[in-house]
Amino acid sequence: VRDGNGKIVLVDNGTGNKHLKQLSYYNFFDLVDLKDELQRRDVACEDVTDVILTHLHFDHCGYTTQKEEQTGGKPLFKMAFPNAIHWVSRAQWENFLHPNALEADSYFIENMQAVYDSGKLRLIENDTNLCPGIDLRLFDGHTPGQIAPYITTPERTYVFAGDVIPLAASVSPLWISAYDTYPVVSYNEKMRMLEEAASEKQAVIYCHDAYTQCTTVKKVNDFFKADQKVSLFSIG
């Protein structure tokens, strides 16, 4: 996201390539190199000013660091976005450092150690304004302290739902992911997000959906459904 005032903000950065062999049972396919994708948009990794990490599961922050082999020594992990402030909630950071049994396999310390060492980690404890037009709001359920960026343009507000609503099909309130650590909390938090999205005509971005990137949502009695598809190009 470009804010028009010099900020280039990246929301999550995917699985990366450091642990693909270790995670091969997920059967990843059609993976792309994020650096190449950014270059296609005339953005270098060094240009990114802020990285918002919705949470620290490997599939959302794996590209935060890159592995460099050291001759005769341990591998070195360097920041992929060396000039960027990295935004994480304090609740998620504490969960990352001291994970519960259900989430332990989703966290890799090497994804974040270089960021911590650099001093470019910013921990938020409450809903926070990053800059004009970008607000960071906290949601629990899938994991403690997940950040959902709310990106406001002249046309509408976009909600990067992360794993609060990972797929368009997940708009159905009772469809809770098996990966959610606290399913009842997930339901309540999803309803909170959907009520506002429907009433304010916000567009919800689905980060795990291969077919539907973004839609508005519509309330039907006590339930919700994905409604009109929305282009993401107007975000900037």
Could you tell me what each predicted segment is?
Residues 13-16, 56, 91-92, 141-143, ...:
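Active-site metal-binding loops of divalent metal-dependent hydrolases
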Residues 29-43, 47-59, 71-138, 187-201:
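Metallo-beta-lactamase
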Residues 65-68, 137-147:
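Active-site glycine- and acidic-residue-rich loops that bind
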Residues 62-74, 215-218:
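Metal-dependent catalytic neighborhoods of phosphoester/phosphodiester hydrolases
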Residues 1-36, 40, 148-163:
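Conserved beta-strand hairpin/beta-sheet module of binuclear metal-dependent hydrolase folds
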